[in-house]
């Protein structure tokens, strides 16, 4: 019998690298690993949680698991995501172990699933995650308020419930539903360009649409999830509604506002959160530009939201931890200080493009830069862990992405860089906390 522990860091990464290179030996070996995984041979291993006295890592790996299963079994995207929850969960958990990521984190094609529930026409490529058909929007300005609450007991919601049941069964971690936030859901079913046009020309309509989606889709789905899984969590995702795409002021007054109004702002005691607003540097840059314009006679308008206010409003919809994503482009020290000020742990992201082998022009330079960045991230995470009121379990039971977080890994990720980054995690001394 294959022992999954024999592929602990960095051996699993070396296997992934050989598989990626296309060697027949590696393909046969990785097939034997996944044969065993899907048969349930590793289920006991999956119940081992990340150590509570260490800085750990998490990763979104569903695209990498799809690439492997498509290569070794010919499993298509639709089959992978929608037909066998045990295969799906075991494959994703196995990929996490091969990578050397100690905190398990279950993800799927959440933007696609969220709009497919409503009847949006989808595209399912064989080897890649699904997406909405951009040429056939589900709703428009004339009919958007006719959208009603879907049935959460069947179809995509049931598929997700089954994945979460299996994940909880195998890992013991609390179930985490991942769905689109109102703005990103609107972008997928209304169309990015029409929605952006209305952001500029008809903001009242946009806010009414976001509230309608929240009331008819998001809130009922949250309530369904928490009824099925009373210990559950909900991660809303809103990349399209981020400061980088629609600006800090619109992010505040539209995207985040539509979440803040849910559950009177309590967000089910913080168990509903959105941690993926990206592009914080936009607020920082625009704030500096505003100060420089004060000495000029320009009457042009500028954002009213600076980096500190943006952080405040992001915290209002992600109350349990502080997130710094790669696209934020703000020094990690700022997020370290914000975490300490708010007495919450810090998560720092490694962007998918940073470790994409097709995007890296100079691998040695990338190794140097990412190695140094990862060292800074791990140092900041450890400092926060040692200074805040951290529970004894270090939140390893909670299902959110924590500590060093690979935002998306796939079949084109440069596994040598992943190994280099994770070395900083593995080399980090244990967390030292004062004892009473």
Locations of regions flagged by a protein language model:
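A gly/proline- and charged-residue-enriched helix-loop-helix capping module
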Residues: 127-165
